[in-house]
């Protein structure tokens, strides 16, 4: 399993009725992924239009597929960061 921090924000230049509908479907999409244990945490970014989600996936390809299925995929910019579990790292001597 690999964990990724995914920050996404909406491109306000693409504001439309279609974008508004996509945003309305994000909570349902997030709940579905949390139920499947593919998303461990979801946060709203205060003062902006977007979110911060932590994905726990089997591969880069699975992450790409889940991002592409997000309702806001065509309206958002993504910043994807791989995460490392610092407690799993060996201590240097």
Q: Each predicted region: which residue ranges?
A:
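Conserved, structured core segments of small domains
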Residues: 1-93
């Amino acid at each position: 399993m690999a964990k990724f921090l995914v920050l996404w924000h909406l491109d306000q230049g693409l504001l439309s009725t279609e974008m508004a509908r996509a945003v309305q479907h994000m909570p349902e999409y997030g709940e579905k992924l949390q139920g499947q244990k593919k998303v461990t945490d979801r946060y709203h970014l205060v003062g902006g239009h977007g979110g911060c989600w932590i994905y726990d996936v089997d591969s880069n390809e699975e992450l790409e597929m889940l991002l592409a299925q997000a309702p806001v995929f065509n309206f958002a910019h993504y910043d994807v960061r791989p995460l490392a579990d610092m407690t799993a790292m060996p201590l240097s001597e």
